[in-house]
Amino acid sequence: MKFPLLFAIFLFAFVSLGWPAHAQNRDHLTEKEVDWVREVQVLDKRIEVFIKAADRRILVLVNPAAQQTKKEEEKWGPLPTGTKAELLADYKNILEEAEEKLDDAFSRNDALIPKALSKFKEAARKQLEQLRTLEAKMTEAKELKALSEAIEEAETVTKGEAK
């Protein structure tokens, strides 16, 4: 009688500890996007990489059947995949990573901060318009929460200032 009980406890612990860890393994950038972030070291161009990555998530969210040109696919890799909530979380994380890169550049007094910030804010304004149209397509609470967080992060970017 002890064996089945111990087995059940072990199984429950394994499953409950394993699932959250699995959920955290998702990377917000594709392999090609990561390569571009590593390769492009000039601040304003690196921010453009993050903008492109964020735009790709919005493209898939707005049009799940979206296609890209062969040239785009060679450069950026396949379009990102995932649930609506995952793509929105990826979008938010991309913005947060870009903000971190801007903060790092600020600490180094990078002369390109105003240019990079201007590009970032303008892109976030355009993305906000598209994000706001997605609410009608969201059916689950998890999706609505992810959308709300993505919108909040984009709004934060639009208010950003070079210090």
Annotate each predicted stretch with a short phrase.
Residues 1-5:
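Positively charged n-region of N-terminal signal peptides that target proteins for export
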Residues 7-18:
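Bacterial N-terminal signal peptides
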Residues 23-163:
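Long, charged/polar, soluble alpha-helical segments
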